[in-house]
Amino acid sequence: MSIASVSDLSEGQSLKFEFVRAGQILEGVLVRFKGQLLAYENRCQHLPLPLDYGDNRFFTKDGRHLMCQMHGAVYEPTTGVCVRGPCFGARLAALPIAIARGKVWLAHGIAAAKPAVKRQNGRADRQKDSGPKRA
């Protein structure tokens, strides 16, 4: 399922979305870092809590890492590996994505459940055209 348009995210932005896997609704985050689009489950590896603590902030202030807002675990954006904090060496659960026809798609077997929410300029904006679509 399509979760976003490729053009929805500028460098250093994040986009939160819900998806269904094995009958469970889970939360994911799509980030653009160094030109790459990457997707992870929105779940810290230290404790099973959202990285953003509900405020849709994923990047550190300097924009170089992803960070868990609860206990400060810091993750390398391109690999998902924790480089500092209580779960050092653990890896965020990556979500397989593909880019086709100008859209970012979740892998087969994972379905988008709700429209994406993009983090931009200190506020979250609900995306009008990036919600779940039937294939």
Where are these regions (language model features)?
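Short Gly/Pro-enriched loop/turn and capping motifs at secondary-structure junctions
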Residues: 73-74, 81
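N-terminal pre-ligand scaffold of iron-sulfur
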Residues: 1-62, 76-77, 91-135
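Short cysteine clusters
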Residues: 44, 68-71
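Short cysteine/histidine-rich metal-coordination sites, predominantly Zn2+-binding motifs
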Residues: 58-68, 82-90
